Design a protein with these regions (language model features):
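A membrane-interface helix-boundary motif in multi-pass transporters
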Residues: 169-193, 394-416
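Multi-pass alpha-helical transporter architecture, strongest
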Residues: 194-207, 410-434
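Juxtamembrane intracellular "pre-TM" segments in multi-pass secondary transporters
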Residues: 2-18, 208-254
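Structural signature of the two symmetry-related core transmembrane helices
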Residues: 85-100, 314-329
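Central cavity-lining transmembrane alpha-helices of secondary-active solute carriers
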Residues: 58-75, 290-302
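Helix-loop boundary and gating motifs at the non-cytosolic
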Residues: 8-66, 248-289
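Hydrophobic core of transmembrane alpha-helices in multi-pass small-molecule transporters
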Residues: 29, 97, 108-125, 257, ...
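Helix-to-loop junctions at the C-terminal end of transmembrane segments
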Residues: 70-82, 168, 299-312, 396-397
Length: 434
């Protein structure tokens, strides 16, 4: 093991991850590049089609609603047919959405349908990701596995920026199209289709994990039962959902809801914000997102060490609280390089807490409740994005670009502060520090 590897504990533990965990990380890298391309370029594509910012916000809201409606059914289904099947189904839905979007042209109804289908597929994958990793990792390696997976998500942002900003433009130029025109976005969609096909193929290599499949004896000795333990109340619960401690559930998901409301006003539309304020072209804009993702990768990989030093809860509170001043700079600085720096540091700090929070949350509930918690977290996040997206659209329609974004940034700062304070207060003293 090299000194660099020792400095990044997630990478040092990679060889000790389960075979399926390593395959899942590979699938995350491949399909995650397609997902990142969607988040970076989808709104820009709609703007290139001539849609107003308020209309783009409504498309985002409808997509969030579709994701919200998918989360609990996907969670319940995964308990019956296995996480792998739901992962594959989500990838198939995403692939179908891309094909539909490519064929849609400027038909708004078809575009909305494609966005909804994509969001549904993405949510199906999201709600089973944390339970799948928890069920394919040993307790002493869980923080590292979650950290590496989150870091991979940000590596894919860098890959996506290169594919979207350089490769797609070069391909479009070679074919005689305008590198800044609609054809380049359609090349990006084609690249996404290829990535999703490869990602789906990787998912099919995962071992069968339907309920009849048992966990390894070693995990059972460590107190980790089968991935799908039988709960005598499950048959009586609505949609197969079992929640033993509702108060704890609320405390785990409410901070995320507040962040979701704030994030829904800004994060999906950061590409439009940066482009509109500074006039960047497609390649430059993708480059900005690549730079911001790089710092996040490093921060996420060192977060397990922070968790061991300060404890899971304290480390999450520290990095999230430190990110808030950079939100202020991001929203209100008139200088491009300070906005890029603020975006990079803010992303690094805020996202660095995500893998540790996910691991912490999975450990706060019984094994049979993990998928339910993941679904509840996803649903409340998506509901937050619905409210946030509606508020964004209203502000853009009523106040215009500058004042509308100013109100949105003030709101996200207040909500992030409240969320961080509540999480720290409710869970002070909880969580592992080793």
């Amino acid at each position: 093991m090299t000194a660099a590897t020792r400095g990044l504990p997630g990478l040092g533990a990679f060889s000790r991850f389960h075979r399926d965990a390593r395959l899942f990380l590979l699938a995350s890298l491949i399909s995650g590049a397609a997902i990142s391309l969607w988040w970076i370029d989808f709104n820009l594509y709609l703007q290139a089609l001539g849609l107003a910012r308020a209309t783009i916000g409504i498309v985002s809201v409808i997509a969030s609603v579709a994701g919200t409606l998918t989360a609990f059914p996907a969670s319940s289904l995964s308990d019956r047919v296995g996480r792998r099947t739901v992962l594959a189904g989500g990838a198939v839905a995403g692939l179908a959405a891309l094909v539909l979007l490519l064929a849609a042209g400027d038909n708004l109804v078809v575009i909305v349908a494609a966005a909804g289908l994509w969001s549904a597929g993405f949510q199906a994958i999201s709600v089973v990701t944390a339970p799948y990793m928890a069920e394919h990792s040993e307790p002493e390696h869980r923080n590292e596995l979650f950290a590496v997976q989150f870091a991979i998500q940000n590596v894919t942002n860098i890959v996506a920026a290169i594919l979207g900003g350089v490769v797609a433009g070069a391909i479009a130029g070679a074919l005689g199209f305008d590198p800044a025109g609609l054809a380049t976005y359609r090349v990006i969609i084609g690249i996404m289709i290829v990535l999703m096909v490869i990602g789906l193929g990787t998912i099919t290599l995962l071992r069968d994990d339907r309920p009849r499949t048992q966990q390894s004896p070693r995990l059972q000795r460590l107190g980790e039962p089968a991935a799908f333990p039988q709960d005598p109340r499950r048959g009586r619960a609505r949609f197969g959902i079992v929640v033993r401690d509702r108060g704890r559930f609320v405390r785990l998901i409410l901070p995320g809801f507040l962040i979701g409301v704030g994030a829904g006003q800004v994060i999906p539309f950061l590409n439009l914000f940066v482009q509109g304020r500074f006039g960047l072209d497609l390649a430059q804009l993708n480059g900005v997102f690549a730079v911001t993702a790089l710092g996040t990768v490093i921060a996420i990989l060192v977060q397990p060490r922070l968790a061991r030093r300060f404890g899971q809860v304290t480390s999450v509170v520290i990095v999230q609280a430190c990110s808030i001043p950079f939100l202020m700079a991001l929203g209100f600085s008139p200088v491009l390089w300070t906005v890029i720096a603020a975006m990079a540091v803010r992303n690094a700090l805020m996202n660095a807490g995500n893998p540790i929070f996910s691991a912490f949350a999975m450990e706060q509930v019984d094994k049979a409740e993990r998928a339910t918690l993941a679904a509840a977290t996803s649903v409340t996040w998506q509901i937050g994005w619905v409210f946030g997206g509606l508020f964004y659209s209203a502000m853009q329609a009523w106040l215009g670009f500058d004042l509308g974004y100013a109100v949105n940034f003030i709101a996200i700062i207040v909500l992030y502060t409240a969320s961080t304070a509540l999480f720290g207060w409710w869970f002070r003293g909880a969580g592992r520090s080793r």
